[in-house]
Amino acid sequence: MKLTIFAATGGIGRHLVGQAIAAGHDVTAVARNPASLPAEVRAVRADLATAQPAALATAVGGADAVLSALGPRSKAEYGIASTGTRAIAGAMQVAGVRRVVVVSAAPVGAVASPRRPRPPKHDPGDGFVMRHLLSPLVNAALRDLYADLALMEDILADSGLDWTAVRPPRLTNKAETGAYRTAYGRNLRRGLTVSRADVAHLMLAVLGQPETIGQTVGIAN
């Protein structure tokens, strides 16, 4: 399969690239600073904070699917998920590429957005501790980040593309296990963490699962 991976040098992106190569995929890897990418990929330099769809056309052209691990590395980059995803979606529409899988976050199901101005107060998969203790603290601290990710999901839902958004909880650097749990449209009870490597594994796996199109997918170890 021909894959284009955005944010290919980030925490999840590095795992996506490595696992895709190991699985025998033909990989185009897009990054702001692509010097550290492995020799097996076709490297493309792009800054998704400012990129226009036309500038990404060569990166997505001919791809069977696009995977994006785009997200901010600091508060100064809040907004990059929606901005970059809008450019990626536009490039895909021009190139005639339909399948896209992105990384979102577990709290986004309860975050308001233009498309969902009145979301549920709690994600249906969250238990008591998450609903009443952890979520209020995390959501308050990272409100702008989650609003950006919610807008990103709106952009995909309105794009006409065959999208899937993976919503992990707190990310860790543990090894890939493949033993994670998943759920459509909700989070996982007692699902507090998941490794970046397992998120990458799921993102590649859903490419062969057409039932995930138009879905958010919760994941946790």
Q: What is each PLM-predicted segment?
A:
Residues 80, 84-85, 148, 166, ...:
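Substrate-positioning beta->alpha
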Residues 42-64:
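Conserved Rossmann-fold cofactor-binding substructure of NAD(P)-dependent oxidoreductases
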Residues 113-114, 159, 175-180, 206-215:
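Glycine/proline-rich active-site loop of Rossmann-fold NAD(P)-dependent oxidoreductases
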Residues 30-35:
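N-terminal Rossmann-fold cofactor-binding loop
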Residues 73-102, 108, 151:
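NAD(P)-cofactor binding segment of oxidoreductase domains
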Residues 153-174:
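Conserved beta-loop-beta element that borders a ligand/cofactor-binding pocket
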Residues 60, 64-67, 77, 101:
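N-terminal Rossmann-like NAD(P) cofactor-binding module of classical short-chain dehydrogenase/reductase
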Residues 3-25:
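N-terminal Rossmann NAD(P)H-binding glycine-rich loop of SDR-like oxidoreductase domains
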